[in-house]
UniProtKB/Swiss-Prot annotation:
GO terms for molecular function: indole-3-glycerol-phosphate synthase activity; phosphoribosylanthranilate isomerase activity. Its EC number is 4.1.1.48. This is Indole-3-glycerol phosphate synthase. GO terms for biological process: L-tryptophan biosynthetic process. Pathway: Amino-acid biosynthesis; L-tryptophan biosynthesis; L-tryptophan from chorismate: step 4/5. Belongs to the TrpC family. Keywords: Amino-acid biosynthesis, Aromatic amino acid biosynthesis, Decarboxylase, Lyase, Tryptophan biosynthesis. The lineage of its organism: Bacteria, Bacillati, Bacillota, Bacilli, Bacillales. It holds the Pfam family IGPS. The keyword Lyase applies.
Amino acid sequence: MGTILDKIVEQKKKEVAELYETYTPVKTKRKTHSLVEALQQFTVIAEVKRASPSKGDINLHVDVRKQVGTYEDCGAGAVSVLTDGQFFKGSFHDLQTAREESNIPLLCKDFIIDKIQIDRAYETGADIILLIVAALTKEKLKELYSYVLEKGLEAIVEVHDEQELETAIQLNPHVIGINNRNLKTFEVDLSQTEKLGKRLNEEKLLWISESGIHSKEDITRVKRAGAKGVLVGEALMTSSSISSFFEDCKVNI
């Protein structure tokens, strides 16, 4: 059967093959916005997430333009957009809409396994590319990270355990994302942030906490662990008061 991640990667291989048949990258350069600069103070990366394999439909018919505008008005330092269609019901159209609406750093949240996906994300308006260590060989991770740099973009290199963390540290990446969700089981454990954060603090690397962040208590916990930001999707997509969530993020520790 394989894990959920295995299934997603298999689907991405099909999508990449289709991209090579249907898409020709444009060789134009454009201005980009820096997440690293945004993370000089504690930052919320607010996500547009219609659905997920673990939760099903979350906010399927969201008005992306309105949601992103609200995020920016409330003080988001960056916006993340799911572009995977099969498992998360996102699209590159959502990414494009977010770019049209916003002038803050924009993350293409997908399962990137090939350079052509980075080309497409760049052309659609992304400033940041997510590279998931669990989805890539060490060689492929290094190759894709180099390509991100070549394009003038930034990367969040995502890890879930100690082994993946050591692989990520070798790249000395812009930002490391500790995913509290195990992509093989989709279970969430916020203690991963505390556990792996210690090592990243020792290395003096810039890092954020991703997944499972729903409350003021969660924000306090990851701030105490040393996170310079949080990536939040579900909590914001289902919130009746997005501004209240952002107020909670201002908690002092």
